[in-house]
Each structure stands twice: as structure tokens, then as C-alpha cells.
Amino acid sequence: MSERKLFTSESVSEGHPDKIADQISDAILDAILAEDPDAHVAAETAVYTGSVHIFGEVSTTAYVDINRVVRDTIAEIGYNNAEYGFAAESVGVHPSLIEQSPDIAQGVNESLEVRGTGDQDSLDLIGAGDQGLMFGFAIDETPEFMPLPVSLSHKLVKKLADLRKSGEISYLRPDAKSQVTVEYDENDQPVRVDTVVISTQHDPEATNDQIRHDVIEKVIKAVIPAEYLDEDTKFFINPTGRFVIGGPQGDSGLTGRKIIVDTYGGYSRHGGGAFSGKDATKVDRSASYAARYIAKNIVAAGLARKAEVQLAYAIGVANPVSVRVDTFGTATVAERKLESAVRDLFDLRPAGIIQMLDLKRPIYRQTAAYGHMGRTDVDLPWEKLDKVDALKAAVEA
């Protein structure tokens, strides 16, 4: 009998407490960047019953009405009812943002390369905002070059939100989670969905039978291709039996606690740094986007079935301390050729990444739910496939 393997990933909806925090942090970032594209921002958010706390460091010339940004974000997510224990116009909003540390700012504003040589190359000017390692990944098992388990998980909770907001399933509330287990064959190809778990917040009047029927028929079967579902696929719908209390009333939420949901669902490695609330001088965010951009173009070029790119930085230094490409034995050319092509074609200094991907724009709130990578519903620059031909030419040279 051929060997079959299972892999599981999860996602959470925009109404999950941690995702509320991420969206508030990125909404604040976007509001600041809209007025001051050169701002440095590190905005953290904590949410719990009836309260939102904003804290962190900002250097900017912009004035932003944080109170209004927070309330508008909460309202757009769908927390507009005091019964939920967390409502846009009644929550307490407590901002506590201070100026960025001058010790950090001096390394970001003037990199070690510039301080050491006096060189005025504009792309050498910005040093990395912190040390760290970042990963980007791509695989050919979905059209968006993402692992199937996390791709399906995102689409399930996004479908729940769409049905809630349209009123088609009127008893749904904003908080929800999904989890998908995919079975792979001996060649690491996905062959079926083994298990789907969905927990969705609901009004108290909704029955378990009604929720189960609607979620299976209107969500799961609408999202997951029929060829992946069979009579042995298991569905666990609200397995606790009741999910009325949810959102920040049920659990506190904090920016940066869903980093695996934000990326590849655990299918690829992660450097540990979160994204939301950070401007692009923070390589936790910008270098992760650059690494995804590189990996996706490598796979789309047919140079590997899957690719993982690692970048690493030292604080205050512009150039990465390391660049690695791992194709897990699937490459059609030597990995050293891929690494050489990456170094030649992609400027991986922070200022180079910012310029390459145009990251000073207010584009981040839309990434803060349903994944930062592999999105087909929004236009994100790190998802472009404009380096495919250049990569092919570089490895053939």
C-alpha cells in the first residue's frame, strides 16, 4: 500500500481577537503612511471585553485620529452590537504611543555602510530596523503557489465572513476559526481533504443542526473543490456545541499572535517576527515579503516545485548577512545558481526592498486578515510574477 501523509493548517476570521488587534495596528499604520510615507511605526494593540489599548513607538510628522481609526476598523469587522461585549462606538480606546528610540533610529536612518564609508548610495542609507531571519515560500500545488491546507483554511473563514456580511446567514457573528487536514500521496501531491474543522460564533437562537447544515452546504462545499471531498472526509462543525460568546468578550487579543496563519500555515519555516503595525524599515515584515516574492517567481519560472528563501539581517546594517534558497530536491538547476541569480536580480537592502515593492504606501490593513501571502482578492506587490523571465535567463547564463 502506498504511503499517505496528512498535513494540517488553520486560519481565523477577521473577527478573531488576535486578528482584530492586527487590523487595528495596520489601520493605524496605513493612516500614518497616508500622510507621512517616511514614518517609522511600531504599533501594538491589545483588545479585551469593552477595551482597546494601543502602545508602541512612532516617528512621524502626521496627525492621526487614532480613536476614530480604531472605532471605524472595529465597525468594519462587524462588532456593532453591544450584546457582543465589544462594540465600535462603546469600547474604551486607550492610545499610548511614544517616539522611536533614538538609539534604534540612528541605525535605521543611517546604515553602518554609510557611517563607515560616507558613501551616499541612497539604497545603502537605511539600515535594518532589527536583527533577525525571515522566510518566504512558494509551492506549485495551488494556482496562487501556496500550500493547499492554509489556502483552503483562509478561503473557508473568508466565505463565512462574506455570508455574514451579506446577511445570507443572518445568525453568524464575527469570530470564527477553520482548520483543514489534507492527505498527500507518496509524491507529496495533495489527493483529498481528510478533515475540516470550523468553529463559528453565532446568535443564541441558532441550532447546531442548522449551523452544521449551512456551514457544510454554503461554506465547505462552496470553497473546497469536489474532487477533494469524499464519503470519508470528516466535518467537525462547532464541536463544543455552542459558540455564542466570542471575540474579545471570550478571549483577549494581541497583535502578532497569528504569525503562522499570516504566512504558510506551518508548511514552511518562520523566523518568528510578526508583521502587523510595522512599517517597511522593519525587516520582519518587508524582508518576509521580499522572500515570498523571490520564492514565488522561482516556482512560477519552473525552476523548482517548491522553494524556501531565507534572508537574515543585522540591526543598522543595510546588506543582508545571508541569503539562502532551499528547493527540497525539486530544483531543475543547481541551488547555487538560484542563489546567485537572486543576489543579482533582487536588491535585498531594506531601501531596495521598499523601492522594489513600493512599500511606503498605505496597503497593509488589507493584509491583516486572511493571510499576507497568496492573496488573489487584493493586489499585493510581493505576489507579482514579473521576475520569471529574468530568473530563467540568469540561471541559463
Swiss-Prot record:
InterPro entries in alphabetical order: ADOMET_SYNTHASE_CS, S-AdoMet_synt_C, S-AdoMet_synt_central, S-AdoMet_synt_N, S-AdoMet_synthetase, S-AdoMet_synthetase_sfam
Chain positions recorded as Mg(2+) binding sites: D18
Keywords: ATP-binding, Cytoplasm, Magnesium, Metal-binding, Nucleotide-binding, One-carbon metabolism, Potassium, Transferase
Residues annotated as binding L-methionine: E57, Q100, D251, K282
Domain of life: Bacteria
Cofactor: binding comment: Binds 2 divalent ions per subunit.
Gene Ontology CC terms: cytoplasm
PANTHER family, A to Z: S-ADENOSYLMETHIONINE SYNTHETASE
HAMAP family: S_AdoMet_synth1
Protein's name according to its UniProt entry: S-adenosylmethionine synthase
Annotated source species: Streptococcus thermophilus (strain CNRZ 1066)
Organism classification: Bacteria, Bacillati, Bacillota, Bacilli, Lactobacillales
